[in-house]
Amino acid sequence: MKRTYQPKKQRRNRTHGFLKRSKTPGGRNVLKSRRAKGRKRLTTRAPKK
């Protein structure tokens, strides 16, 4: 049986990335709260190659 989670960097970033978060009011709240908390990473990102 195939497992449910088949990770893909591109899909992860498109779904949970900065641009997607910036588009919706709720996503902007997420960014705002993570900035206020002082998070080093606001959203997911592809590691540098």
Swiss-Prot record:
**Which GO annotations describe the biological process of this protein?**
translation
Pfam families noted in UniProt: Ribosomal_L34
Recorded superkingdom: Bacteria
UniProt feature, compositional bias: Basic residues: 1-23, 31-49
For region Disordered, the annotated ranges are 1-49
What does the entry list under GO cellular component? ribonucleoprotein complex; ribosome
Claim: Ribosomal protein is one of the keywords in the record: yes
Q: Which GO terms describe its molecular function?
A: structural constituent of ribosome
Q: Which InterPro entries match?
A: Ribosomal_bL34 (IPR000271), Ribosomal_bL34_CS (IPR020939)
Keywords noted in UniProt: Ribonucleoprotein, Ribosomal protein
Q: Which family does it belong to?
A: Belongs to the bacterial ribosomal protein bL34 family.
NCBIfam families under this entry?
Answer: rpmH_bact
Protein's recorded name: Large ribosomal subunit protein bL34
Q: Which organism is it from?
A: Anaeromyxobacter dehalogenans (strain 2CP-C)
